[in-house]
Amino acid sequence: MGLGIAAPATAETPGSVTIGAQRWSAENLAVTRFRNGDAIPEVSDAGAWAAAGRAGRPAWIRYGNTATPAGWGVLYNFAAVTDPRGLCPAGFRVPDNRDWRQLEAALGGGKTAAASLKAATGWPTGVAGSNRSGFGALPAGFRTQQGAFFLGRRVAYFWSRDREANGTTIAHMLFDDDRPLFRIEYDVAMGMSVRCVAPA
């Protein structure tokens, strides 16, 4: 089982943790500019969020349009995730489905991997993880394609950068119970958390 080896944040790179052959950011991304310095629009209005998603325009927002717990980061739509200007810091990228599967396998798979990925605090009583990996996943919830917010403090949703043949993408989810890491197709106009990955 690949337990994580932590590295602190610097001015150039996020805090990270090495798990198996991968290096992952140790917190949800919270940048509001692309790597080239261009601003990513903050879109608080529900109608404007829906319009941005339909048009493929990048957007970000804090869960609930308000201050959130430390480590939650911000929620991005898929256009921000895949924008060629780059969402993750230099040397990192948004993971694809294979990266997520590799991470899960390095931690033993199934419920064991899920518990290792979840933070030891910040979840409802009795459902926190062990955080043995150092990944520290938190239940930052998601924003629907219509602009509503759901399941903050209950579920963690993470983007992958792959787009499916039917136009959707795959979300990777950790629940407020003992279920394993879960994958589900979601609309690209959703708002979800982002982690970044690099070779170890």
Annotate the PLM regions.
Residues M1-T10:
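N-terminal export signals
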Residues A11-A200:
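Conserved positions within compact, well-structured domain cores
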